[in-house]
């Protein structure tokens, strides 16, 4: 997968997270949970985007690794919201599948980049 595919998919994921969080805020879901999900869900794409201007391969890898950590955190908050009946099973699985796809792409990219060092 190319970096542009990662950028596109991570931005789409962030938008879906934002749409979900708007709904959750309207339902008066715990603000801390909603804010954490927005923060980490949008940070994935922000770090991938920022990597385009990395100062070198190590910096590029670092940005992707941060995106990977944010992806893992995002999945945690989705699980918590699902397990507390704040989001539907359908919504959870849709976003979780997107998150897993991003994580796989990031892991693959980081492994490839580390081999090039």
Task: Tell where the protein language model's regions lie, with residue ranges.
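Short, C-terminally biased terminal segments at protein or domain edges
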Residues: 1-117
């Amino acid at each position: 997968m190319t970096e542009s595919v990662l950028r596109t998919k991570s931005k789409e994921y962030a938008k879906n997270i934002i749409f979900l969080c708007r709904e959750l805020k309207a339902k008066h879901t715990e603000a801390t949970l909603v804010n954490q999900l927005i923060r980490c869900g949008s940070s994935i794409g922000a770090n991938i985007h920022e990597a385009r201007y990395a100062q070198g391969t190590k910096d590029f890898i670092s940005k992707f690794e941060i995106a990977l950590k944010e992806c893992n955190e995002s999945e945690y908050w989705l699980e918590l919201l699902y397990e507390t009946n704040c989001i539907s099973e359908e919504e959870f699985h849709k976003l979780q599948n997107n998150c897993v796809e991003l994580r796989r792409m990031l892991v693959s990219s980081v492994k490839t980049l580390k081999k090039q060092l």
